[in-house]
């Protein structure tokens, strides 16, 4: 792993926020492509999987690197990963940062969301919305949305495109009928 430098811009996490949401907010505020921000905080931006392992749990090295770059504590970082729910809502393989599928209602594929919460908090995604049993917003008394209203994709099924600056709170899937190496985003 390369040496991580302290980032000049700070964006505090929102209470209950998912790690990838906070990193996207940091990239957005820094006007930096998501992949470049991931590299700057010591995460591999091109892991090659649908969702990176650091969304599930951070390794000790990853947590140390992110803490060094952002000054956010290791404990705060852990609460932004699914490891926060380990043993209660999900089970994580101890040797790899992957979820055990045998745990009922543990992890949903992608994430649901409350549009009102997203509007109120500036487009930040709650970690609890990723849990399979999370289906309603207790603050706004409404069902969580589980597909993009424009492109019908499951939100947050993959991490944000590494070559683009995140448009937080907007769908990052390719727009319907978009094509090319980096197609236009849905942005709903």
Predicted regions and their residues:
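Domain-exit/linker segments immediately C-terminal to small folded modules
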Residues: 6, 145-188
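SIR2/sirtuin NAD+-dependent deacylase catalytic core
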Residues: 113-116, 139
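A structured, charge-rich N-terminal accessory region that forms the first stable segment of a protein
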Residues: 1-110, 118, 123
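Residue-level detector of solvent-exposed, low-hydrophobicity positions
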Residues: 26-29, 136, 140
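Short metal-coordination and nucleic-acid-contact micro-motifs, chiefly zinc-binding Cys/His arrays
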Residues: 107-110, 130-133, 141-145, 164-168
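Generic alpha-helical propensity signal that fires on short helical segments
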Residues: 37, 50, 90, 95, ...
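Short, intrinsically disordered, charge-biased short linear motifs at domain edges
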Residues: 98-105, 122-127, 133-139, 151-162
């Amino acid at each position: 792993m390369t040496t991580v430098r302290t980032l000049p811009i700070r964006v505090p996490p929102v209470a209950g926020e998912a790690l990838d949401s906070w990193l996207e907010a940091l990239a957005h505020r820094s006007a930096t492509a998501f992949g470049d921000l991931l590299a700057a905080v010591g995460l591999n931006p091109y892991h090659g999987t649908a969702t990176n392992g650091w969304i599930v749990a951070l390794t000790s090295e990853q947590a140390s690197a992110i803490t060094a770059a952002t000054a956010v504590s290791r404990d705060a970082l852990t609460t932004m990963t699914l490891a926060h729910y380990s043993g209660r809502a999900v089970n994580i393989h101890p040797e790899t940062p992957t979820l055990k599928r045998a745990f009922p209602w543990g992890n949903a594929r992608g994430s649901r969301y409350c549009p009102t919460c997203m509007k109120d908090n500036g487009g930040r995604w709650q970690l609890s919305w990723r849990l399979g049993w999370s289906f309603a917003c207790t603050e706004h008394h409404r069902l969580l949305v589980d597909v993009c209203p424009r492109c019908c994709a499951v939100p947050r099924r993959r991490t944000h495109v590494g070559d683009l600056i995140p448009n937080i709170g907007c769908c990052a899937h390719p727009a319907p009928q978009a094509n090319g190496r980096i197609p236009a985003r849905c942005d709903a």
